[in-house]
Structure formats: structure tokens, C-alpha cells
């Protein structure tokens, strides 16, 4: 891969992670109220469902991440990251327009099934980085995390 292509790939990964983490950040302040409205309960009851939603996402991601990793080895990092972003978009649409709590669970499970974008992005960074630039390039993922977790909750707070 040429130097320009590697730089473009690193930029793609940074933007992808920024979008991904900003999306996570947006739902943080919104989800408790959304759950409470869907279950017609208070915030205490909503927190129980929030825990189960988090578990549903985490367990499906835990189970499917090795499969996603194998697929990224076979078909390339970029297509897997793009599919993962599409699935996250679908998850966020389901979160926004869920008529019932079940749809929230469906959305989080879909996101968990394809939620290996961070590990795939890390593998992509390792693939395109020279040993001298690897730490700097991994730092870009950290910067995307930090920026996403600043921007996302602000947007979520304004929308929620």
C-alpha cells in the first residue's frame, strides 16, 4: 500500500471511530428517559432495562467478535467496518423510533452482532502502520474516542 493510501486509510479509521463513538455518546443521556417512556415506568425501573440492554449488546458482541475478526481477515477490514457502521445506523434508527422495549433490544442485538468495528479498526491500524508510526496511529483511535465521548453526550443532551 502506498503512503498516500495508508494516510487515507488512517483518516478513514479516525472518522469511522469518531462517528461510532459519537453515536454511543449520543445515546448515553437519551436512553434512560426513552426506556422509562417505553415501559411507562420511572427511572429506577428504566435502569434495570438499561442494564439488560447493555448486557444484550455486550454478550452478542463477545460471541460474534471472533467471527467478525475472521471475516475481516478474509474479506478485508474496510468492508467489515462499513457493514458494522451500517448496523450501528440501523440500531440507532431502531432506538429512535422504537414503539416498544422489544425493539430496543432488537436494535442492541443487531449492533452487538456486528459491533466489532473498534477491534477491526485496530487491526486496520496495525495493517497500515509502520513500526515507527504505529503508536501515533493508535493514538488517533484514542483521540477519536475522547472527541466522540465529548461531542456525543452534548448532542444527546441537546436532543434529549
What are these regions (language model features)?
Residues 18, 91, 102-116:
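Hydrophobic core of transmembrane alpha-helices in multi-pass small-molecule transporters
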Residues 34-62:
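Extracellular/periplasmic helix-loop-helix junction of adjacent transmembrane segments
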Residues 58-66, 116, 149-150:
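Residue-level signature of mid-helix packing/kink "hotspots" within the transmembrane helices
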Residues 107-146:
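Cytoplasmic helix-loop-helix junction between adjacent transmembrane helices
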Amino acid at each position: 500500500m502506498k503512503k498516500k493510501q495508508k494516510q487515507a486509510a488512517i483518516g478513514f479509521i479516525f472518522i469511522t471511530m469518531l462517528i461510532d463513538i459519537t453515536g454511543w455518546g449520543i445515546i448515553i443521556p437519551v436512553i434512560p428517559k426513552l426506556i422509562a417512556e417505553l415501559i411507562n415506568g420511572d427511572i429506577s425501573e428504566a435502569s434495570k432495562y438499561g442494564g439488560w440492554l447493555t448486557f444484550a449488546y455486550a454478550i452478542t458482541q463477545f460471541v460474534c467478535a471472533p467471527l467478525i475478526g475472521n471475516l475481516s481477515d478474509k474479506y478485508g477490514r474496510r468492508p467489515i467496518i462499513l457493514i458494522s457502521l451500517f448496523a450501528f445506523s440501523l440500531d440507532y434508527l431502531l432506538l429512535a423510533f422504537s414503539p416498544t422495549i422489544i425493539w430496543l433490544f432488537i436494535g442492541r442485538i443487531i449492533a452487538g452482532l456486528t459491533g466489532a468495528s473498534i477491534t477491526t479498526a485496530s487491526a486496520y491500524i496495525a495493517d497500515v502502520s509502520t513500526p515507527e508510526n504505529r503508536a501515533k496511529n493508535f493514538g488517533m483511535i484514542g483521540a477519536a474516542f475522547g472527541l466522540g465521548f465529548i461531542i456525543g453526550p452534548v448532542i444527546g443532551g441537546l436532543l434529549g
